[in-house]
Structure formats: structure tokens, C-alpha cells
Regions:
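Acidic/His metal-coordination segments adjacent to aromatic residues that form catalytic metal sites
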Residues: 60-66, 118-130, 182-195, 260-269, ...
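Long, well-ordered core segments of solenoidal/helical folds
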Residues: 31-50, 104-132, 161-193, 228-261, ...
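The feature captures the catalytic groove of carbohydrate-active enzymes
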Residues: 169-221, 225, 248-280, 284, ...
Length: 473
């Protein structure tokens, strides 16, 4: 635990958590800057006559400005998912009467305009639900479509979820008892090009099971439930080593289900422990436990979390791979930290429900420390909202002339202000891929899913009643 923790704060009457740590984390999670950064990017689409087809992924060479990907790329759902998380947050704060002091500013987008941008940014994503050439439909659809349904009962989003789940299920193979991840995989070291010979499954795919479980419950479809559970069991069997570190990729024989190879595509080596892969495993197995309540999945998630925590450096932010040589320039991965933190919050929730407060509190402390250490080292400088001047427009008048008039009864325009070179992402220090044989290497940048899971962590704290407990201590 960090030495600047300060005196303990009592949460829900039992957890004793460092006050300074909680305060720093909550100020970052619920700051005006968080909303302003997302709004700055989202509002660029307000004046367009057509919905977006390009979606933010990572920051470029300037470490500040987003590089965009096409709507069919696997990360397309995270930015609109972030918009929906912030829209949901307004409801959670209101319902729980939790008002962190950093969110009290009146300058914020109107909820209806916020809702419009949520729908606008997702208008072109519904078509992805029909794709059967990718395992990433959970990432591409669930972050925004589940919120669109739960918040607004959006029937289009509901239909998209159902279509996406069945499209994803079409990639399940009875012989392998899992969902195919990649049809092909090509690096400077190897090339898998024939799906009839190779059945590639990655640890990341655990996060795509949630959409199957969700639709299975909504539509009473046992087949979707069974497919999701079978995939989790197969991943337990093949992706997890005896020491509970994880393999990234497992190649199975598509006819027999026998293991042909185990290797990495984004880690340091085939035998190393890629940090984000370990994090995907923690959160994925916890989501599976939440749906099935089978203790084996909980135990697996806990074991993976313990490896993650045991291998953290002293400053609490994971290197991109736990087995990569440690140097002054070795990249970190803040996305791995945020994904793992969300998984550990679910561990807290699970063990609290099982009435094991000691274990529950351990993982709550661990999750908070992960976020706190990330905030201390990798939170980008803040931006803020500022009201623009009274709006003046040109109005057509007789004799082909115009005159100026102030708009009446309208909220002043909001603009986002900050340092001239302020980053568009909330966090920096992420690493997409630093594998030496990768076609391209990315490290030390902002990343949309690092920010998404940072925002999700805040909403999870609200849902668990932890934020208002601290605010009213």
C-alpha cells in the first residue's frame, strides 16, 4: 500500500480504506475533466449530416490526438460505450444522492443532447450485429447496446443485441467446445492462414461471453448460455498454466479439439504472461461467475488476480508483460490495470455476497490501489467546460439584408478548454502491442478501452454504493 495513504475511512461500516487514496481516485473518476474530454471528441459529430463511421482508438505520435478506426474494427464500441457510461452516471448519482465535489459544476451538456450523441455515435454500429467473421461482437456491441436498452428501452439496440449474440454463437464448434477467435493470424514469425486446419482461440474472447449470457437470459435461450459456459470451461482447460499465468493464443485442431500450439501474439514471448491477457482473464471469468454462480469460475478469477497483483512493480502499474525485461523505457499498460481493477471489484462483490469480508476487502483495496497508482502516474492534464458568449446569429430580413440578434432562452454554448496540447484521452501509458514480431508495435499512448474501463470502474463503485458511503463519511 502506498505510504501516503492517510488515515482510514470507514466504508459501509466495515471496510477500512485509506482516505487519501479514495479521495484521489474519486476526484479523478468523477472530475469535470472526464466528461469534458469525452464530450470534446463526441461533440465534433454534432454538426455532421451523417452519423460517424470512424471511431477513436488510440493517440498518435503527439500522444494527444486520437487516431480513428473504421466502424468494423473491434474497438468501435468503446467510445459510444463511454458516452453511455457517462449518461448512466448521471442517473446513478441522482438515485444514490452521491455528489462527489468535483462533479458539482453546473456546466455540463444537456441530458437530451447527451442522449442524442449516444444514439448518433451508434447509428452505424447496428450493422455489425450481422457479422459472422469476428469473435469481437461483444466488444463491438455490448458496451453501448446494453446501456441503450437498460436506460431507454431502445428496441433497435435490443434487436441488435439478439442478432449479435446469435452471430457470435455461429462461430462455436462442437468439437473444440469453444468459439473461434481469429480466422487468420500473421506476424513476422508465423502465419496461420487456413481455418480448416487451425482453430485459434485467444484469452480476450472471455469478454465476449457476456453478450451471450445477457441475450440467453433475455430470450430464455439455453443454447446461448451453454455455448458461453462451454467456452469458459475450454479456456480454463487450455489457456491457464499451472501457476495461473495465462497463454494468449491456443491453436486447436478444428476436427478433434486437440491442442496444436500455444503462443503469443501481443506478449513478450510464448511462455510469458502478457499483462492485458491476464486482466482479460480476471474480468472474463468474473463475468462468467456472475452469470453462472459456479465457484470454479470464481476460484479461477481469484487465482489469476493473485498472479496479477503479485507481479506488479513497486509503483503499482503493470508493465505490458510481466516477464519482459525491466528497463527505464519498458512500456507499461494502463489498459491492463483498468481491466484488472474492474475484475477485482467483481471479486469484492462476490466475496461480500458470500459473507467473506476479509477476502472481499482485500480485492477492494487491490482494485483501488491499481486505479490510484495509475491516476498518480498516468492521468492526463485536465480540461474543463466553459460557457461561450451569448449566441449571436444572422437572421434573413426583407430587402435581402441581414441583422444580428441574440438567441433567447437558450443555454449558452459549452466549449472544452485546457492546455493547448491537452490530450483527448483521460489516461496515457497504454500499450496496444509490443510483441517484437508484430506487424506493427504501439506503446506509451492513450487508448480508448483504457478510458472505457476507467469510466466503468467509477460506475461500478456507484452501483455498489461505495461512492456515497465515502462522500457521507
Amino acid at each position: 500500500m502506498s505510504t501516503d495513504a492517510g488515515p482510514p475511512a470507514t466504508i459501509n461500516g466495515t471496510e477500512n480504506l485509506p482516505t487519501k487514496q479514495w479521495t484521489r481516485v474519486l476526484e479523478a473518476l468523477f472530475s469535470e475533466s472526464v466528461l469534458a474530454k469525452v464530450w470534446h471528441v463526441a461533440s465534433k459529430a454534432i454538426g455532421s449530416t451523417t452519423p460517424p463511421t470512424l471511431y477513436p482508438e488510440y493517440t498518435g505520435s503527439d500522444k494527444s490526438t486520437y487516431i480513428y478506426r473504421t466502424l468494423d474494427f473491434w474497438t468501435s464500441g468503446f467510445f459510444p460505450g463511454s458516452l453511455y457510461l457517462l449518461l448512466e452516471r448521471n442517473t446513478l448519482l441522482r438515485e444514490r444522492h452521491a455528489t462527489p465535489h468535483s462533479t458539482q459544476a453546473n456546466l455540463r451538456p444537456h441530458p437530451l443532447q447527451h442522449e442524442h450523441l449516444c444514439r448518433w455515435w451508434t447509428a452505424n454500429l447496428h450493422q455489425n450485429a450481422l457479422r459472422k467473421d469476428t469473435h469481437d461482437l461483444g466488444f463491438m456491441i455490448a458496451p453501448w447496446a446494453i446501456k441503450a436498452w437498460t436506460l431507454h428501452r431502445d428496441p433497435a439496440a435490443y434487436n441488435t443485441l439478439i442478432l449479435a449474440a446469435h452471430s457470435l454463437a455461429s462461430r462455436f464448434n462442437e468439437s473444440t467446445q469453444c468459439i473461434r477467435s481469429w480466422d487468420e493470424c500473421i506476424t513476422k514469425r508465423y502465419a496461420y492462414k487456413d481455418p480448416s486446419q487451425d482453430y485459434l482461440v485467444i484469452i480476450d474472447n472471455m469478454l465476449n461471453l457476456d453478450i451471450l449470457f445477457w441475450v440467453a437470459r433475455e430470450t430464455n435461450c439455453r443454447r446461448l448460455y451453454d455455448i458461453a459456459k462451454a467456452h469458459a470451461i475450454t479456456t480454463q482447460k487450455h489457456h491457464i498454466r499451472d501457476d495461473y499465468a495465462t497463454f494468449h493464443v491456443v491453436n486447436l485442431d478444428p476436427d478433434t479439439g486437440e491442442v496444436k500450439d500455444k503462443f503469443t501474439n501481443q506478449g513478450y514471448s510464448d511462455s510469458s504472461c502478457w499483462a492485458r491477457g491476464q486482466a482479460w482473464g480476471i474480468l472474463g471469468f468474473m463475468q462468467t461467475y456472475e452469470w453462472t454462480k459456479e465457484r470454479g469460475f470464481l476460484c479461477t478469477a481469484r487465482a489469476l488476480a493473485d498472479v496479477f497483483l503479485d507481479r506488479l512493480p513497486d509503483d503499482g502499474v503493470p508493465y505490458w508483460d510481466f516477464d519482459a525485461p525491466v528497463t527505464d523505457t519498458e512500456p507499461r499498460d494502463t489498459s491492463a490495470a483498468m481491466i484488472a481493477a474492474c475484475g477485482m471489484l467483481l471479486l469484492y462483490k462476490a466475496y461480500k455476497g458470500l459473507r467473506d469480508r476479509e477476502i472481499a476487502d482485500h480485492y477492494l483495496h487491490a482494485a483501488m490501489r491499481l486505479v490510484d497508482c495509475t491516476v498518480k502516474g498516468y492521468l492526463n492534464p485536465p480540461v474543463r467546460f466553459e460557457a461561450g458568449p451569448a449566441s449571436v446569429v444572422s437572421v434573413y430580413a426583407d430587402q435581402h439584408s441581414t441583422h444580428q440578434t441574440e438567441r433567447q432562452n437558450l443555454v449558452e454554448a459549452l466549449k472544452v478548454v485546457g492546455d493547448e496540447h491537452a490530450a483527448e484521452t483521460i489516461l496515457t501509458g497504454a500499450t496496444i502491442n509490443n510483441y517484437e514480431f508484430a506487424p506493427r508495435r504501439w506503446s506509451n499512448h492513450g487508448l480508448i478501452y483504457a478510458d472505457y474501463y476507467f469510466l466503468l470502474f467509477g460506475n461500478m463503485l456507484l452501483e455498489m454504493g461505495l461512492v456515497d458511503s465515502l462522500m457521507h463519511r
